[in-house]
């Protein structure tokens, strides 16, 4: 089971606070700045994070990256529709409790985080459209 899985935005420069604009569809939701880690090659922003949710991990690896029985790794999200596909996977798991398996969390415990990830991915799509050439990865520490 993948221990740490998530999506990161990698930038050479720190994101200007003006870029943390509210998404029109979600005006009533407060956006905090994403967790940021600074490394020698830039800033890593945690857009989404799952811990020990292999049902989500497996769906993303199998359906988007054609990776079956993956031993982990870093996978670049470089096609425009991949963000929507990940959102669809998250929505599917929220709406289909029978699909929720192999996780240390119950769906009730995880649903708030999953919903926030869906919103964060909408922000990411908008950000990527305005900032061409940014790097986005799905990481899996299996």
Mark where each language-model region is.
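Acidic (Asp/Glu-rich) sequence patches and key acidic residues
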Residues: 1-134, 141-142
């Amino acid at each position: 089971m993948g221990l740490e899985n998530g999506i990161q935005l990698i930038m050479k420069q720190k994101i200007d606070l003006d870029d943390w604009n509210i998404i029109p569809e979600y005006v009533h939701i407060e956006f905090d700045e994403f967790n940021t880690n600074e490394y020698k090659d830039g800033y890593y922003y945690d857009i989404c994070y799952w811990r020990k949710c292999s049902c989500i991990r497996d769906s993303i690896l199998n359906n988007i990256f054609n990776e079956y029985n993956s031993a982990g790794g870093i996978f670049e999200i470089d096609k425009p529709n991949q963000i929507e596909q990940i959102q669809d996977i998250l929505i599917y798991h929220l709406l289909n409790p029978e699909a929720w398996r192999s996780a240390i969390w119950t769906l009730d415990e995880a649903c708030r985080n999953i919903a926030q990830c869906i919103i964060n991915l909408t922000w990411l799509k908008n950000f990527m459209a305005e900032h061409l050439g940014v790097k986005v990865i799905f990481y899996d520490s299996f």
